[in-house]
Amino acid sequence: LNTDGSGNFQLVLNLSKSRTKLNSISKMKTVNGHDVPSKEEIKSKFADIEKTIAKTPGISNVKTTVDFTNYIASISCTFTQVNRMNDVVKNVYAKENGKAKAPEKIYDYTPASKTFNRLNLFSFKNEYTKLSNADKEIFATANYTAIFKFQSTVTATSNKETKTAPSKKATMLKLNALDIATEKKSIGNKITLTN
């Protein structure tokens, strides 16, 4: 994140630890009652998401990659203001979920306040409790990692699980996906910056 509120975003979905299992699953039609998408369907879905993101004002340099050898996918883009990333989330959410309403804001940054917020407005607890035990197993070994890099110096973070880099220019929050799904831990974080 640049001091003026512009920056770069990258989302990485790394399933490489499950590569052997995913190779087997990819040869099946269904698993645990869920249809298994083909590689072509997955590539098409990422291409659709890329197009949706690219249509968002203030967003540029949109790129998606899908690696079926290592099972790593990524989406990256450049934004003119942090609020443009909120628009990206709303646009993708609307395209994928129809009439369901996306949160208005998950990121907040005002250059004058020197405070960056990653809000935790998603709740998966009800959906998680409805999952089969086989589906719930996925969450036990999955992790969520958020790394934020800044031009300014990090002086404080609100989430006690956050680690700040020795340079004071980056933070990392790594949580078990099960703890997030059951709301034992939060991805919310207020990061205070200074010049």
Could you tell me what each predicted segment is?
Residues 55-195:
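Mature, soluble, non-transmembrane domains
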Residues 1-58:
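Start-of-domain marker
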